[in-house]
């Protein structure tokens, strides 16, 4: 992706005026001016127009001396230089906050940080967001905070992807900070639409596809994009993981394979089916469960059937995976927590510091909710029915049906406590209907995730002395 040219490139000030302004800045800060001014003169002798510096090769821009770098920081924070996202990503700014004191940049960054605080972001996360994302966005665009646009954030994201490809570094800090910044800008009213997960999800799919042949990777990603409109996000993510595992296996057994149409039952599918039965968990090293084996096979079978039904080109013209290839799964009755284990777990959850997720688990237990139903609850989910008490409206879930669950006074008080701990902010789009919704469970301006719930329950179960617990057990307890 080629980054667009800036619409508000700074004008070229007189070098003498820049030196005078820098000297006054140094004097106001009580710093020695001689060496710093000497470095500034050298910079302006080499690049009388700071815009020429911005157009130089990245290696040249990064090779200047530290004292010259301090002058560059001054130019940046005063709006005289847009050094390029590649430079802003590659360079570590030690004195950025100090240098921008008293500027519009500082005021905008402070306003951004206050909004992040109101949404519940921790101090360290807020600091990273402000410096790594917000400040760099404002510097390179030359805009005030209220003037930022979706295109500006997308341009920054594209620059991070270019830097990742150029350096081989993951740059996860930048990726996360930009994602969080979208949330803050939306709740500030700067961005008009809630953050879309599709862009971040697509990058996640591409990263998962590492080691997959390019031809297959393109088909897999296109298939996942097609699923977004009809499947839950976690379903698409799981499908991406399974297709990536399949693609890496194919790369090992047939490095020259470049298209699905080349797949052969004897040469590719049967060896892969055998490999699935012998697969081990990437962390524990234990054999994967039969249910996971079935999910891996089903993901590939459904993909092959879907693309053939849709009439995609270069796909197999015959069935490659059959019902007899799927392992049979034992069907035990739903497991519940024994009374003593349930009592210990509730005591631990009542004392956990992360109230929003701990209370979510307590509400799931009290109402017998599926985890998806729990997280889809809306802020106005409690309904008072005259003469019949309080009821919880459970939204469309796994079975695509709504239902009402009676509430006792203790559970109503629990929901009131959840409302106090949830993150405030603007409504978010429902992943299925697309309508704007005030969800009950929000944190840092976004929805609480299933992963966080599972992690919280796992930690609480360990603290309570339980070997294992998963959210669905709470539904049946």
Predicted regions span which residues?
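Charge-rich, intrinsically disordered N-terminal extensions
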Residues: 1-319, 328-331, 347-352, 362, ...
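Short, basic (Lys/Arg/His-rich) helix/loop patches that form interaction surfaces
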Residues: 120, 124-125, 357, 367, ...
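Flexible interdomain linker/hinge and immediately adjacent N-terminus
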Residues: 193-212, 312-347, 391-402, 433-448
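Conserved tyrosine-mediated DNA breakage-rejoining catalytic core shared by Y-recombinases
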Residues: 271, 376-423
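Basic, Lys/Arg- and aromatic-enriched nucleic-acid-binding interface segment
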Residues: 290, 330, 339-375, 432-436, ...
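Short, charged phosphate-coordinating catalytic segments
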Residues: 305-314, 363-387
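Extended, hydrophobic alpha-helical segments in both membrane/secreted and soluble proteins
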Residues: 370-374, 378, 403, 411, ...
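Active-site/catalytic core of tyrosine-dependent DNA strand-transfer enzymes
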Residues: 408-466
């Amino acid at each position: 992706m080629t980054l667009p040219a800036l619409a508000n490139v700074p004008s070229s000030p007189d070098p003498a005026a820049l030196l005078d302004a820098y000297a006054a800045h140094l004097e106001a800060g009580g710093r020695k001016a001689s060496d710093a001014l000497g470095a500034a003169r050298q910079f302006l002798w080499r690049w009388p127009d700071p815009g020429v510096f911005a157009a130089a090769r990245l290696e040249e821009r990064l090779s200047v001396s530290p004292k010259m770098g301090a002058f560059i920081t001054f130019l940046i924070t005063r709006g005289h230089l847009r050094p390029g996202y590649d430079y802003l990503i590659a360079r570590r700014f030690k004195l950025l906050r100090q240098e921008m004191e008293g500027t519009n940049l500082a005021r905008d960054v402070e306003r951004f940080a206050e909004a992040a605080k109101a949404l519940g972001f921790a101090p360290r996360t807020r600091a990273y967001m402000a410096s790594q994302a917000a400040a760099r966005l404002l510097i390179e665009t030359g805009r005030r905070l209220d003037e930022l646009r979706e295109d500006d954030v997308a341009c920054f994201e594209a620059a991070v992807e270019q830097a990742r490809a150029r350096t081989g570094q993951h740059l996860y800090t930048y990726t996360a900070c930009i994602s969080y910044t979208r949330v803050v800008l939306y709740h500030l009213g700067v961005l008009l639409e809630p953050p879309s997960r599709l862009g971040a999800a697509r990058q996640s799919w591409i990263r998962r596809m590492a080691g997959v042949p390019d031809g297959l990777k393109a088909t897999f990603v296109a298939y996942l994009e097609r699923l977004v409109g009809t499947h839950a996000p976690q379903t698409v993510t799981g499908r991406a993981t399974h297709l990536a595992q399949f693609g890496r296996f194919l790369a090992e057994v047939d490095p020259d394979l470049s298209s699905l149409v080349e797949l052969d039952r004897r040469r590719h599918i049967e060896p892969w089916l055998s490999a699935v039965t012998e697969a081990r968990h990437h962390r524990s090293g234990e054999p994967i469960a039969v249910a996971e084996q079935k999910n891996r096979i089903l993901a590939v079978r459904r993909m092959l059937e879907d693309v053939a039904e849709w009439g995609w080109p270069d796909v197999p013209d015959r069935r490659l995976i059959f019902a007899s290839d799927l392992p049979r799964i034992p069907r035990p009755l739903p497991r519940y927590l024994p009374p003593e284990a349930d009592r210990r777990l509730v005591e631990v959850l009542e004392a956990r510091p992360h109230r929003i997720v701990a209370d979510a688990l307590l509400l799931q237990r009290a109402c017998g909710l599926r985890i998806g139903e729990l997280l889809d609850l809306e802020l106005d989910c409690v309904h008072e029915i005259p003469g019949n008490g309080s009821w919880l409206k459970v939204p469309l879930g796994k079975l695509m049906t709504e239902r009402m669950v009676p509430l006792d006074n203790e559970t109503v008080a629990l929901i009131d406590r959840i409302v106090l701990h949830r993150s405030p902010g603007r409504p978010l789009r429902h992943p299925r209907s697309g309508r704007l919704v005030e969800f009950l469970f929000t944190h840092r301006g976004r929805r609480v995730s299933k992963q966080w719930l599972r992690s919280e329950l796992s930690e609480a179960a360990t603290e309570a002395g339980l070997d294992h617990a998963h959210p669905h057990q709470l539904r049946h307890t």
